Amino acid sequence: FLGHNSKHHPSNEYYPLIAKALGRDAIYFDYTTSVEEALGDAKYLGKFDVLLLYANHGTIKPNQWKNLKSFVENGGGFVPVHCASWCFGNEPEFDQLVGGRFKSHQGAIFSARVTDTKHPAMKDVKAFEAWDETYFHTNHNPKNRKVLMVRDAMKGDPHTKPEPWTWVRTQGKGRIFYTASGHDARVWNHTGFHQLLKSGILWAAGESAQTRYH
């Protein structure tokens, strides 16, 4: 779990919530707020099945990006959550890896709609209602991407089409699971969000890790 030291999207507060919730299901995290610690050493990164990113890190160094991209393309899982789709703006390929980039938001109580109930990343996932930021995305990368949840258009939206909300991608041997959910504790405390991350993490981890898990 790569977070950050910030009062905005305070991962230091939310990490314990998800660690406790998913720890009950034998999904365990190491936590850091340092991009260098998480991505600077390819061997260290390679010890993990999945990297979860929830932070506002503006830049990434070339060697860090190389390690992240190699980790995914060689079979690692990548789970960028919410504001992670804003990260690393100095590396254009990062948006393509995630599948899109955060553009703007408002805020409201809403429920994102599941559009593909049969995808394994949606196993046991149900739509849940909570206050969250109403993300819009840009720089979409449809290659090897499957949208699994959408946010239907709301008052004040710049367009009337459903907004892609949760999606999966594959790149090389790796799997990427992204969701725009996760602004604050109203979401991070929600059991529906816990299940969404659990299913997404297990899918992103890949079949060999799933075999060990079961």
What kind of feature is each model-predicted range?
Residues K20, R24, K43, G156-P162, ...:
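Extracellular ligand-binding/catalytic regions of CAZymes and related secreted enzymes
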Residues L2-F88:
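Helical hinge/lid and interdomain linker segments adjacent to catalytic or ligand-binding clefts
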Residues S6-K7, G58, S85-C87, A153-K155, ...:
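Short, solvent-exposed loop/turn segments at secondary-structure junctions
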Residues G58-A127:
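A glycine-rich, often tryptophan-bearing local segment used as a flexible ligand/cofactor-contacting loop or short
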Residues S11, K61, N90-E91, P158-T160, ...:
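Alpha-helix N-cap/helix-start motif
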Residues K20-Y28, G100-R175, A180:
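Catalytic beta-strand/loop cores that center a nucleophilic Ser/Cys/Thr
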Residues Y31, H105-Q106, R212-H214:
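Short, hydrophobic secondary-structure boundary micro-motifs
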